[in-house]
Amino acid sequence: MSTSTLSDGSLDEGTFAAEDVSGVIEDYFFEGAEKLLEIWFDKNQNGATSLRNIPYSELVSMLDIAQCRILHSKSNECMDSYVLSESSMFISDFRIILKTCGTTRLLHAIERILHIAKIYCNMDNVVSVFYSRKNFMHPEKQPYPHSSFETEVDYLEEHFAGGSAYCIGPQRQDRWFLYTMVTPQAVFPFPEHTLEILMNGLPEDVLSTFSPNVSKDGKDCRMKSAINTILPPDIVVHEELFSPCGYSLNGLIPHSDHYITIHVTPEPDFSYVSFETNQHTLNLCEQMLKVLEIFKPSKFLLTIFTNELSNEGKKMQKNLWDLKICGCRRTNLQFLELPTETLIYVQFERIKSAEQVTCKEVFDR
């Protein structure tokens, strides 16, 4: 096991990852890894209302710029959830989360987001920004500015001043990119944490479930894949089983702005699954292990952001730091201290001699 250092040096990811997909048919490829943008606005700004006041038609126009569209939505008293043609969007009073896969142009939507927040919500003071993604298998297929993290950072800096950019992971292996901007006005007086699991190299018997040939609809897919076992019992879900294959699920925890989102790219040559949540209902450690047991990835990375007020998040960070998984070896472990949060980042890969990824926790729950 080697632990590489966190670096904000070279941000060019190159095309090295394409070596892992030599069997891909050249005229068909889909980039499952998402671009993830989270923007917090100042809730104390004079006259500020709610981002949920933005008209639906304006959201549609904004997503047109990003080159994706809304398939369906659900709401509770705290948040609106949207399953998109390429991943997800969540909007609460002062935060928007936009997560898009494929060759979407997510960062091009920033200017429109800022514009409609000002027009419809009287908000023009951004207090916190997070943008992150895993390295792409084929960055050369991405539109500007997404073909390299360096150009993405330049683009972000055109809209948000004073940010920091990080590249975490070995130069010639899977890596994770993070851009953050936090102002002194960014105060979060409540427990906050976010867990993300990004998985590659899934077995074909797992992947086959996420197709209309095996599952008749999203609910059937959720039950056959056992995804239902990793969801809180009172969660409100909406989901999409795509044709010819693929799956997305958003879930809202009642009476809160907590969510779960899952996205599956099931083509064997470039399989990818993401799981993300900020839920406080279930034990995060147990949930993480169930996710890994369901999808059985050959490679995966985990991140957990937490602030000082989240005991569950801090506990999860400690557990990730000490985590050992039977059948896997840890290839990277990092800690990053940010102005309002801390981050633990860890990567694992399956040991080739192991028949499957068997997840056994060796830490206290």
UniProtKB/Swiss-Prot annotation:
Gene Ontology BP terms: spermidine biosynthetic process; spermine biosynthetic process
Enzyme Commission designation: 4.1.1.50
PTM annotation: Is synthesized initially as an inactive proenzyme. Formation of the active enzyme involves a self-maturation process in which the active site pyruvoyl group is generated from an internal serine residue via an autocatalytic post-translational modification. Two non-identical subunits are generated from the proenzyme in this reaction, and the pyruvate is formed at the N-terminus of the alpha chain, which is derived from the carboxyl end of the proenzyme.
One term of GO molecular function: adenosylmethionine decarboxylase activity
Cofactor binding, per record: Binds 1 pyruvoyl group covalently per subunit.
Family assignment from sequence similarity: Belongs to the eukaryotic AdoMetDC family.
Protein name (Swiss-Prot/TrEMBL): S-adenosylmethionine decarboxylase proenzyme
Organism: Onchocerca volvulus
